[in-house]
UniProtKB/Swiss-Prot annotation:
Full protein name: Small ribosomal subunit protein uS3
Organism: Polynucleobacter asymbioticus (strain DSM 18221 / CIP 109841 / QLW-P1DMWA-1)
This protein's record includes keyword rRNA-binding: yes
PANTHER family in the record: 30S/40S RIBOSOMAL PROTEIN S3, SMALL RIBOSOMAL SUBUNIT PROTEIN US3C
GO CC term (a single one): cytosolic small ribosomal subunit
Gene3D superfamilies listed in its UniProt record: 3.30.300.20, Ribosomal protein S3, C-terminal domain
């Protein structure tokens, strides 16, 4: 089932966290959830050229805090912060509460699954061959530190009459290992032949998860245990220290002497009996 389930939902509360972080009662839950969906759709259209990876929405005490993760924060902020102020006012009008907008920069966009998927779909819309776009994205991700990547495209590839799906994988992508940090994303390319879907899985290594502190303590205790094992008992030939409170000088230990047992051989008879 690791091949079928959504990797992000499979790891929620284990190694992944929710992108909407708030609590609501039964009457307000549906309204607030719809607001989150509308805000994400609006930001996706508004910041289409800003390389936005994800949007985290928090609602502390009748306020809203929206964090936008982008590899091009300058496009989001605009000249002298004008664009982000317009964006904040529009979001405040849509949500009906005071909104604070934060921008987080993504240092390695080549390893981010959402940005990889969006890049491939943009190339497909420009009529670039899907195999070339997929292989180029895989090479860039592996070059910049990804331990594994898998990309799948499905639809009328190259304008074929019969829809099909093709996928390529490089490195390891352990989908059923819960401690594996799998970044998963999807995107759609609107071509003249129809919609082509792109799915991306990026394996970034193993994470410690909730028991991070316990495992970190265990790993730090291992070198100390190895040091104890490698320590040897002091040699018997070491110098002996005088007792505390005495003025006696340090007495060097006597070298160990091997005792040899001397066996006396009986004297040989010089005369034979009867002579």
């Amino acid at each position: 089932m690791g091949q079928k389930i959504n990797p992000t939902g499979f790891r929620l509360a284990v190694t992944k966290n929710w992108t909407s972080r708030w609590y609501a009662n039964n009457t307000d839950f549906a309204k607030m959830l719809k607001e989150d969906v509308d805000v994400r759709i609006y930001l996706k259209k508004k910041l289409k050229n800003a390389s936005v990876s994800k949007v985290v929405i928090e609602r502390p005490a009748k306020n809203a805090r929206i964090t936008i993760y982008s590899s091009r924060p300058g496009v989001v902020i605009g000249k002298k912060g004008e664009d982000i102020e317009v964006l904040r006012r529009e979001l405040q009008k849509r949500m009906g509460v005071p909104v604070h907008v934060n921008i987080e920069e993504i240092r390695k966009p080549e390893v981010d699954a959402q940005l990889i998927a969006d890049s491939i779909t943009q190339q497909l819309e420009k009529r670039i061959m899907f195999r070339r776009a997929m292989k180029r994205a895989m090479q860039n991700a592996m070059r910049l530190g990804a331990q594994g990547i898998k990309i799948m495209s499905s639809g009328r590839l190259n304008g074929a009459e019969i829809a099909r799906r093709e996928w390529y994988r490089e490195g390891r992508v352990p989908l059923h290992t819960l401690k594996a940090d799998i970044d998963y994303a999807t995107s759609e390319a609107e071509t003249t032949y129809g919609i082509i879907g792109v799915k991306v899985w990026v394996y970034k290594g193993d994470t410690l998860g909730r028991g991070a502190e316990a495992q970190a303590a265990a790993t730090s205790a291992e070198p100390a245990a190895e040091e104890k094992k490698t320590r040897r008992a002091p040699s018997k030939t070491a110098a002996r220290k005088p007792a505390a409170g005495t003025d006696k000088p340090l007495v060097a230990a006597k070298p160990a002497v091997k005792r040899v047992r001397k066996v006396e051989t009986p004297a040989a008879d010089t005369q034979k009996s009867g002579e």
